[in-house]
Amino acid sequence: MKTLVKMMAAVVLPALAADAAELEGWWRFTEADGDEAADASGKGRAALLDTNRVWRVTDAPGGGALWFDGVTNVTAAADDYAYALVPDFEELTLSNAFSVAAWIYPEALPAFAPILVRTGDTDEWNDGFALFVGENGALAACVRGGDDAGEVSGGALATNEWNHVALTYSGTALRLYLNGVEIASRTFASRASSDAPAPLGIGTLVGRRRVQPFAGAIADVRIWSSALSASQVGDAYRQFLGETMDPNGDLDGDGMPNGWEIRYGLDPRDPSDADLDSDGDGLANLRECRLGRSPRAGARPARPSLIRSATATTL
């Protein structure tokens, strides 16, 4: 298990409006060790981990994360086992509507690197759904259902920063969100099925050989059996370490907006990080914020620097 930043206390995560009945899976990866990640939704769909290829980190949105190095994680030619998978999703029907969301911290952006994928056709992705890294660093998603298969992509994922990614599917419309903002959509002429007789893969396309591996961290993975509204996706984005924060506000009064601090792994509750120089380029974080620059660009961290929580655990 990899420790990134010492936690000040435990994480609080209040439920979203859609959580109660429609949350089908929620993986926080907070366990200290072991080859399973518990399902915090209460549905009992544990994720199985290949601990030889994926590592745990202790500080992340939701309380923990999985780390994929993009090298060790490459599936061997004769091995179908994924880095992390949820086998119980083979029996889950999501034809009518669903939503998925996660926090990701990519070190690199190889095209078609999987984030969350459920498909029975690992060669052409012709059934099920996928949320993945698109071409040229975009975020991409697809719902496949025979002839009326569709893909959407947009935005620009940031490396060495936390990005909140989400897709919603209503049965006829697919919407893609990056950091709480809709960036692309597609309407289907007829209902496209999102079901597949396959488990859910986290950070990999289950059974796929020679797929581009995801490199970086994945945290706070959630799946709902409904299409979240834009405001609910925004709530999921702002729901970080126990509070629904206004990303444009300044909780600690240090001159840096909450959303900017979250994006770059700073603590929106700690005013002292304004004077720090996180990337060692001679400019304090506050100065970088005012210049519209990344406080992480000067020195790429080997592991993400994550926010510390100052609240107690409530689930």
Which stretches of residues belong to each language-model region?
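Sec-dependent signal peptide recognition
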Residues: K2-A10
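Extracytoplasmic low-complexity segments
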Residues: L16-V74, D123-W125, A184, V233-G253
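Short, aromatic/His-centered strand-loop micro-motif at the edge of beta-sheets
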Residues: A141-H164
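Localized edge beta-strand/strand-to-loop motifs within extracellular or lumenal beta-rich domains
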Residues: E161-R175
